[in-house]
From Swiss-Prot:
Gene from which the chain derives: ahsa
Superkingdom as given in the UniProt entry: Eukaryota
Species: Dictyostelium discoideum
A Gene Ontology biological process term: protein folding
Protein name as catalogued: Activator of 90 kDa heat shock protein ATPase homolog
Chaperone in keyword set: yes
Keyword Chaperone: yes
Cross-referenced Pfam families: Aha1_N, AHSA1
Amino acid sequence: MAKVGEGDPRWIVENREDGHNVNGWHWSEKDCLPWSKNTIGGLFDKKVIQETDEYTFKISSTPVVSGECTANNRKGKTIFLYELDVKMNWEVVFKPKKVLPPPPTTKSKGAADDIDEEDDDGKPAEPIITQKKTISGEFTVPYISDENGDEAPTVRYTINTTADNDETKQSINMVQSLLKSHGVPFVQSQCQEFIKLLKKEFVSKKQVEQSQQQQTANTTTNTTTTTNTVPKVTSSTVIFNSTPTKKPTTKTLKLKEEFQCSPMDAYDVFVNINKLRAFTQSDCTFENEEGGKFSLYGGSIQGVNKTLSPGSKIVQTWRLDNWSKGVESQVTITFSVDGKPLTNVEIVQTGIPIDEFEKTEEGWKRNILDRIKHTFSYSSKIF
């Protein structure tokens, strides 16, 4: 065996500066969070949502973006994984305006000092100019994720201004209507624009080329079909009809994991609503009965419980909310012990649309299994 530094250079693998991941075939990961912060800032910072003669409604601060965002290239395809939380301040500034003063109090008829609606010099009373007033608060977008990238995200808002008088209270009521009718839709629209820009910026060049080539091939095929002359069929012509081979439209996912806990504890993580909320950190619902419905990550994952065998097996129908209507997969989760102080968790999911397979697989690993192990310390070894 050669000593260190004496090996044949022809057999040494180097990390070269001029090396290339040809056609994006090998797995590569790019951190998109800095780009995301800059892009989201440009979409929101100081943007005017609505302006009238009466008020200006705008974003008043640079958005604060936290979370993670990566673009993973594998075999020429780009897989985006992101979970972002965005917060920003807003304000509605009511412009100064002229208002007529309240009418004077009318004294009894015939009084010597009756007050007319005009000043002592006979001129009408001057209008009063109101002061500029500002109502402010915060927008929060708690969950921009690849799980619900095709949907408008949830947007929450708070109002920081206190209604200390009737006039301010009236202004706040008006602002609440503005937030619902213009503020929330604006934030949702800008978030969806961010997703489009993200995919446009980081999608692999190979994937774009393949898409363009496919479009060109389709155009060529259509042109050829239009110009070709259909041959005449005579009595001596024999036609053989062959049944075209159908490509599969779904795939089956199989995952195995080891949890350092009992089968009942492992089972409970998937059916206990409090534990589901703990590791997903999101809105969840779960009817713990056969035939009961469930949803995770604010409805991004939906399904129905078919079989619930405590400590043994769970069978569910399962779908992502962006799948076509009527498309469902089936998930079977089994729990077993194999002589070690741990539980074997095996997940088999059938009927996954091919285009959604990699996203579904990564979602199970990253958003469910890894989170369970980290939240409940089920990955720690027992000696």
